[in-house]
């Protein structure tokens, strides 16, 4: 079994960490924690592809992230939808920005969170220097990204694009219950057994 669990700085390489990584993979569990980076996206993509190639049983992904690189989030979002094995998302801590983009890559019935999870949605931000032409190009790309993300979250939550745009014009925080009411979360769970009880609902959904 390949080893994937390691910190971004490669500071921790120990038999214990290797063993923990292998146990998580055997349990078909993927953890996304911290900033969404290209490196994290590459590691997570490798995990997803390896697990799906091995078995089509459900994969459980825990997301606890402050957000980060949108395109890195896109990579994981698309890979979750690409693989055959269904993925169940569990939000914990906070699920913000690009982390929320990853979280909504599965149908609502496979989106769970723990009771104290908080969610943050907002419009993408960017800064550009250089010539006026470069700044104009960057601004237009940000607008296209905003429209694309609004569509993704509208589809995922059932809210209108206009509502998403209005709500996320500034930082839009939701606690677990508010996230359920908004359509972002399917179910709040407190015990692992509640997720185990959902295994029978782990199949692919044609409505995503």
Each predicted region: which residue ranges?
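N-terminal organellar transit peptides
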Residues: 1-98, 104-208
């Amino acid at each position: 079994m390949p080893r994937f669990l390691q910190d971004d700085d490669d500071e921790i390489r120990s038999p214990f960490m290797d063993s923990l990584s292998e146990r998580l993979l055997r349990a078909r569990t993927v953890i996304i924690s911290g900033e969404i980076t290209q490196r994290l996206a590459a590691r997570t993509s490798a995990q997803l592809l390896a697990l799906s190639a091995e078995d089509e049983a459900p994969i459980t992904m825990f997301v606890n992230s402050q957000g980060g690189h949108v395109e890195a989030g896109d990579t994981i979002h698309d890979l979750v939808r690409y693989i055959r094995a269904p993925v169940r998302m569990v939000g914990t801590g906070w699920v913000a920005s690009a982390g929320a983009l990853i979280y909504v890559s599965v149908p609502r019935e496979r989106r769970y969170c723990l009771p104290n999870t908080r969610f943050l949605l907002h419009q993408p931000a960017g800064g550009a220097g250089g010539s006026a032409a470069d700044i104009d190009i960057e601004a237009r790309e940000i607008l296209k990204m905003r429209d694309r993300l609004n569509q993704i979250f509208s589809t995922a939550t059932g809210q209108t694009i206009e509502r998403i745009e209005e709500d996320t014009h500034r930082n839009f925080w939701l606690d677990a219950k508010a996230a359920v009411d908004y359509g972002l979360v399917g179910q709040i769970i407190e015990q692992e057994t509640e997720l185990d009880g959902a295994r029978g609902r782990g199949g692919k959904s044609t409505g995503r």
